[in-house]
């Protein structure tokens, strides 16, 4: 993957994290409200370089795919996460950790073009930015277990339909 695309995807994940994290503090019942929150959140790339229109368009689409996908599949994602978070109920996880786990798990199951190890590494990078070392280790353990289950075909990609 070219460095520019990798950088853009990290920004996408950052925006998705910010939107999805904010949902812990507000009730969203419609896709329209979710879109409004998404579009009103400042774009990290705009703050750095307002002249890159094509990258902004790309970022919006991948960021939105993550936000909408996690929002629509949160129950499924939480069920998967709970299978691998030994002795931890999903409702007891920290909001940062849970949000990062949901994004990475969504990518692992619904984005076959993204290698699971990339999803794990990106979640760890975001955990470094938004969490602490303890959170990073916790996220690594759960996502690593999910990857091993995918690799041994104990669990499969989820049909999007």
UniProtKB/Swiss-Prot annotation:
GO MF, any single term: RNA binding
Keyword Nucleotide-binding: no
GO cellular-component term (any): cytosol
Pfam families the UniProt entry points to: NusB
Extent of the signal sequence: none
Biological process annotations from GO: DNA-templated transcription termination; transcription antitermination
Cross-referenced InterPro entries: NusB-like_sf, NusB_fam, NusB_RsmB_TIM44
Domain of life: Bacteria
Keywords per UniProt: RNA-binding, Transcription, Transcription antitermination, Transcription regulation
Entry-linked SUPFAM superfamilies: NusB-like
Function field: Involved in transcription antitermination. Required for transcription of ribosomal RNA (rRNA) genes. Binds specifically to the boxA antiterminator sequence of the ribosomal RNA (rrn) operons.
UniProt similarity note: Belongs to the NusB family.
Protein name: Transcription antitermination protein NusB
Organism in which the protein naturally occurs: Lawsonia intracellularis (strain PHE/MN1-00)
